[in-house]
């Protein structure tokens, strides 16, 4: 789930993010200015090992296999989705020994001992501003035929915006892009051979809600503004810090 680490740093949960260049296509490192990027994994891990003595906690997002590179009492694990769904039983068993968080509630089925930590929303960037019209759904290129068909069966007027390497919307430009529209369809799927609808709102769906769009879900309902409080970055980070300290 892109940008979670940077947003959490912005609101007080650390001051540095280490990231592979290939994983930040939306420019979070440029917007928040807390990220060191690396061309290869070996360089990233070495840098993390070199600086870990200066930090009380090492927060690892998704890639739990690297927990063994750091003192056990410092490691905190946060999982976001696809990577966790693909973990084998041995790795799932091993993470039980660490503080674990998941950013969507369905992942509690895999890690029932984890704590649900909603994905944070930066409300300084995403402020109510909508003046647009029409319908938009931002979704993936993978299995597009299946995903687009399912969405348009319920929302026939929606424009399907395919997010791929050539059509990435920069993070700082997302408010302006979304504000062109009045309605956002927030319907995401697993990457299974037969995709399954995901139950929780996506980061983009919450961002659209904060901008004042009407956000529609997979069941034909709309997202409640109360979700903005649940995902508010200040509250999310405070809860996270309370849990790990």
Regions found by a protein language model. Give the residues of each.
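Donor nucleotide-sugar binding/catalytic pocket of nucleotide-sugar-dependent glycosyltransferases
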Residues: 97-127
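Short alpha-helical donor nucleotide-sugar binding micro-motif in glycosyltransferases
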Residues: 171, 176-181, 187
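N-terminal pre-catalytic "stem/leader" segment of glycosyltransferase-like enzymes
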Residues: 1-72, 157, 216-234, 239
